[in-house]
């Protein structure tokens, strides 16, 4: 395209667009942001705005679309949610200041990971940007949140990368534009940067300059050992600088994170436990949504962070527990204060990047005064004492803001009325001139009459000649020497004095001068506030922590959560545990025990579909997770030993993008667990092997269960419909059979959701199908076919060879028939036991008792 064939304004646009080819350019023209050419076409489609034309280029109409300046945020929010980045190009020159178009430049770039405007952010979600820098052995990660000032780095490996990204929930990911860039399994927006931007040397230079240090050892980073992490952190910091058009001043140091700090959870586990998102992608009901009673958005975000980062450090957990206990008696007064607290964390971020608004400062002022009033009595909690000691430190900032900012300032700085009265004498004078000009004129008139003795003297104003002193013709010749003639009339003369001229200049320009001075003073206030950012961030974190801890305290009281105990030996003992989410969704929830220790490491869980197996397993994992956040747990009592990680393999779906079937996804997740599980890991396995043929699935499930028992020795909850596996406790003392009970009443079934010892008697699949609404004809056909299969299995059961053996540790092929037949025997024993268990002789009439006796006799014949 030829620039010479278009207007100067369009030439300017094309020059700016050439520097931002991968972004939409919002080009400020008066009260609109305009988009041109391909940007206009794309924006019109994404935002459903009108596409029009303006002028021509090379004989082709130039396509154009626009959004109003005052409503730009809502359009930016929509674009960012779609993963788009937008360059904001503002008018920075004076209109009509010279020839050609007004000067414009890109003042910032809005990307999914670098948002600070409250209108573009979810109140309860942390917005992070992550940089990924790979080498042959390791992958360096660095992530930051411009809203909180978080800035961290970590070394990881390729097989753990996607799990780390799932944990961090990145809004934007920076990758080197090279062949060595790792493959990601994430929906987050990916931004490609030149590979040289991830160079460790350049990264270390930028980071040391930013933090004002000689090297990064003080942050735990060695230039050789952590080279890829340093490269990632440098690329990230530089990207933030370029997009914000300034170097951020609020990044809270650079910390090195390690696996030993938190209980590990892979991406599948976070998804299956529905911590902050349901399996269907919704925000509720989740663990977070059910627990979140926080009074502040800062508290809600910290709660989500704690849930995704359960602690390993027992001392830190106990400190939180002590705080929760101490807050039980102080919850109400604390909530009264917290409910009045604004989002200090995000206000501080906007101050840091220079886009804070007047009402941000007013909210900050009021919040700091409110925090200073929090007076927790002697708590006995060292954590609470530390937190409450932070708030008085910000009182000087609050006092400064009280002096500087109006009690209720305007929304926009351009409207004035932002800087408080008495803060600056010149501004007060300009306002006095604007608001009290008539008083000045009357005072001047009285003063001049007294000075000159001229009785006809009047001080007046008109739009043509401005301010003047008018004297009658007879007294005009007596005017003082400092009176300068301005206009001669038939019966009067008009004069101007230096004092009146100065006043005129002030009045005529007072509004513009006042607005300009207010902007200057406001910028000065922001500059001073930036020096207090560490204190503001500290106060925000303390307020958020108090909010979460008080929420934990309320949960303990309102929902009967108890303080879990921690042991140094392997154990998961839970008395009457409850699922924290499900119990809030149903009228009555059946509580259940859990007992795992060094003697019983694998619970083989059987029972009907809809019986509650998956709920029970998730319940155990969530109780363990909550205990390690410092929260009390939904149970009558709980004792938990050392836990490093939680793994789940519950449900699956096709991964069409990677050409992987449901069964392949299941096996991949299972393989990861078997390779990584240790004695201090909790494993949940739900119906492993169901996606293939019966014998294949059974053989795999058997081998996986044995691997968990013999090799991994993890605490495992293993739910299955393969009743043939229920023999395992006979071969392995560390395995125990448990089942979810159900009760048949005629042709109906009642799920008791109660964990009981031993294997289940049957799966009740047809009964569940009936509940699902299958046609009666199909149900009858299924029952008939089931009866035939059961009879055939009983009739064709072969005599066991006395030399049949179980698979050995030396790698022998498993004798599937052996454990199938043995399990069938156990299965029929379970049926008889269940029949007897459900029999109540005292409630039977003689005829009913005789009928039950014949039924039991027939049942015995069928299994003999």
From Swiss-Prot:
Q: Does the keyword DNA-binding apply?
A: yes
Keyword ATP-binding listed: yes
Q: Which GO terms describe its molecular function?
A: ATP binding; ATP-dependent DNA damage sensor activity; damaged DNA binding; mismatched DNA binding
Q: What's any one GO cellular component for it? A: cytosol
Q: Give one Pfam family, short name only.
A: MutS_IV
List the residue ranges forming a coiled coil, or say none.
Answer: none
One Gene Ontology BP term is: mismatch repair
What keywords appear on the UniProt entry?
A: ATP-binding, DNA damage, DNA repair, DNA-binding, Nucleotide-binding
Q: Which InterPro entries match?
A: DNA_mismatch_repair_MutS, DNA_mismatch_repair_MutS-lik_N, DNA_mismatch_repair_MutS/MSH, DNA_mismatch_repair_MutS_C, DNA_mismatch_repair_MutS_clamp, DNA_mismatch_repair_MutS_core, DNA_mismatch_repair_MutS_N, DNA_mismatch_repair_MutS_sf
Question: Which SUPFAM superfamilies does the UniProt entry name for this protein?
Answer: DNA repair protein MutS, domain I, DNA repair protein MutS, domain II, DNA repair protein MutS, domain III, P-loop containing nucleoside triphosphate hydrolases
Q: Please tell me where ATP binds in this chain.
A: 607-614
Q: What does this protein do?
A: This protein is involved in the repair of mismatches in DNA. It is possible that it carries out the mismatch recognition step. This protein has a weak ATPase activity.
Query: HAMAP family, alphabetically?
Result: MutS
The similarity annotation says: Belongs to the DNA mismatch repair MutS family.
Protein name listed in UniProt: DNA mismatch repair protein MutS
Which organism does this sequence originate in? Neisseria gonorrhoeae (strain NCCP11945)
